Amino acid sequence: MANLLEKFKNRDKSLLFVPFFVSGFPDFDFLEKFLFKNKDKIDILELGVPFSDPVADGPILQEINYRAMVKGVNLNNTLDWLLDSGITKKIDVILLLYFNLIQNKLEEKLKRFKEVGIKGLVIPDLPLEEAEKLIPLFNEHNLDLILFISPTTREERIRKILDIAPSFLYCISVKGVTGERDRLPEEGVAFISRVKKETNKPLVWGFGLGSSYQINSLKGLVDGVIVGSAIGKRLLNNEDIQDYFDELYKATL
């Protein structure tokens, strides 16, 4: 097992900050410099491996995926970059990728992830039944398989997920795909409030976050926050994201 659960348990701040970036965007050099500069602010880095059909993503992250793929970014050079840069020695990294990328020679790839220092995987297109079968194999390679729950998940499946989840729960708090929203959805807040009563596993709010106000509003409800599209939008616009990143981080304290 990876140490992600311990990280939540032993945190000395209100929320763990989990920024999401797509590998190789805008380029590896920018990402490396930015991540090392901000390593003490990043509790867990969620790094997306570019994919041609990222079904969980909205238009911003779809565009970023496309641009990264055009540049030739893929799973292999992402892993090479992580290893060569030493990022995983300074930051806990989880990869978001689609099962197509790893299902062939799966065990060989899991061994590679462990060698690189990856702590866990988020696989949006992996059915729950398949995930349940794979958790022991992931555990053997010291990798957390991070499972999703959402307001549209059936009650019996929620109970199943809460029972088998080896790590924190990635809470999809809104219907639809990724993307920054103006306010927190009442349905998502109510859903997570209910789930919180049923489990002691950490809950991390994903999808729709983009402001320090929203993050502050989640204190006491969840254990961590993921911010992706809002960061990606600013990168697409060639904005300097440092001040914005600092603002998000401070809201998690």
Curated annotation (Swiss-Prot):
Pathway: Amino-acid biosynthesis; L-tryptophan biosynthesis; L-tryptophan from chorismate: step 5/5
Transmembrane segments: none
Keywords tagged on the record: Amino-acid biosynthesis, Aromatic amino acid biosynthesis, Lyase, Tryptophan biosynthesis
InterPro entries per record: Aldolase_TIM (IPR013785), RibuloseP-bd_barrel (IPR011060), Trp_synthase_alpha_AS (IPR018204), Trp_synthase_suA (IPR002028)
Domain of life: Bacteria
Signal sequence segment: none
Sections of the chain in a coiled coil: none
Catalytic reactions of this protein: (1S,2R)-1-C-(indol-3-yl)glycerol 3-phosphate + L-serine = D-glyceraldehyde 3-phosphate + L-tryptophan + H2O
Gene Ontology molecular-function annotations: tryptophan synthase activity
SS bonds (residue pairs): none
The protein's Enzyme Commission number: 4.2.1.20
Gene Ontology cellular-component annotations: cytosol
Active site: 46 (proton acceptor), 57 (proton acceptor)
Keyword GTP-binding included in the entry's annotation: no
Function summary: The alpha subunit is responsible for the aldol cleavage of indoleglycerol phosphate to indole and glyceraldehyde 3-phosphate.
Family: Belongs to the TrpA family.
Subunit-level organization: Tetramer of two alpha and two beta chains.
UniProt-recorded name of the protein: Tryptophan synthase alpha chain
